[in-house]
Curated annotation (Swiss-Prot):
This is Probable chemoreceptor glutamine deamidase CheD. Its EC number is 3.5.1.44. Probably deamidates glutamine residues to glutamate on methyl-accepting chemotaxis receptors (MCPs), playing an important role in chemotaxis. InterPro entries: CheD-like_sf, Chemorcpt_Glu_NH3ase_CheD, Cytotoxic_necrot_fac-like_cat.
Length: 162
């Protein structure tokens, strides 16, 4: 059985099944959302940039936004055979990559992204099993669909499993 490495770009998402590995790099203030059906060994990974699409008059890429991308990811996973009621989530990213003198929520995209992702997961009744969010360093997320394990490589801090 060949292991595929499936890349997920910024404002992108993709799905895979055992033994695929799904990878996204460049998670700063963005959030990576890994969804997993452990019975079917089907996984999906989304790399969102912004919390909410409703602030924009025209949305050209729904995968950029937490409120739109997560339901699209669930739908793609269901088409691959996943069960929505069997999905579990792990998330990472949401860093504050820049120091702003204005500490308002408007500037704190990483924190806003984290809150929006958690709200959408709760709305969809998808339990959040683990998270690695915040801080001020970039991350890479590697999702192993054979086990559901998510490995986080953080700049200057090495690799850990969540």
């Amino acid at each position: 059985m060949d292991i595929k490495e499936i890349k997920v770009g910024i404002a992108d998402l993709n799905v895979g099944k055992n033994p695929d590995k799904i990878i996204t790099v460049g998670l700063g203030s963005c959030i990576g959302i890994a969804l997993y059906d452990g019975i079917k060994c089907i996984g999906g990974l989304s790399h969102i940039m912004l919390p909410d699409s409703t602030q924009f008059s025209k949305v050209t890429n729904p995968m950029k936004f937490a409120d739109l991308a997560i339901p699209i990811l669930v739908e793609k996973m269901e088409k691959l055979g996943a069960r929505k009621n069997g999905l579990k989530a792990k998330i990472c990213g949401g860093a504050s990559m820049f120091n702003f003198s204005d500490k308002s929520m408007v500037m704190d995209i990483g924190n806003r992204n984290g809150k929006a992702v958690k709200e959408k997961l709760k709305e969809l009744s998808i339990p959040l099993l683990a998270e690695d969010i915040g801080g001020n360093k970039g991350r890479t997320m590697i999702f192993d669909t054979s086990t559901g394990k998510v490995y986080i490589k953080t700049v200057g801090l090495g690799t850990k499993e969540i």
